[in-house]
């Protein structure tokens, strides 16, 4: 945003990217907004890597997710923009086909959210237009952060060449495949390695799922559950942590190695004799120093009923009102206080050894005290620091 002599331009809203701690800038659609294709960056980067001998798969946010995540500030809504957005994606497919792109990936994480009839109608409408007279590069529909229980049957009957499903956070993904099957003329990009956390994959569990899929004669490509941008790049430069902990970690490069090893193991009848399998078995056979049998037992006993919060919201409201005595419209801040220049400066001095850790702790405590006092002085009902 900008506020100054030249004008007042409000910044676009920033929201969390689904259930991650990453954020995105929310596009705003006004009534006079014109939807058109500008893919110069995407096709340019594809051509650049192609000249280097690197075969890539261009990835873009899909049309349905794009429509669902925009903010409509005028009288128009997603349905009004659906045809124009779909036409832009049709043109993108044509451009990629002209560049001899083999696969074009559409990321559609919005499909894992609860979908009502209007959402399903929008999804069908936009892709009906996208696929009208479709020829050219193969389209991969990639989903993540959950399962697509509301539209799985629809998806498998649409002309996608590949479908990416999340087997980590998608609790019903396996069940959906068992119940409705998976088309023999499509490729399943199976998200079997967690793309969001930094832990090693348990090969035994993953290989079992791979065997089940291949027993169904499904054409499977092993993949991560989502983009690897959510994890650090590599373990190679982690020199300060003990190997006792590092051996359990897998960052982006290590997760790619896991995919490669899993692919090799899955092709071998005698995979239990291979070194990669033995190393993984040893890792999970041992006891971690942070293990708690009590916690493991509690987790094993978790059922679907445990995901239902009790008591009901109306009862919780009454209890909270009685306990805290807050007014009907309590005042608070929207979140934590900003990292001011002096806070950043003090942290930098700590890293350089200019101040001691105790001096830094005392400084932070003084800042917290200032924040709390300021909130008390202006009369906020709920304090944060």
What are these regions (language model features)?
Residues 1-385:
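Domain-level signal for soluble alpha/beta catalytic cores
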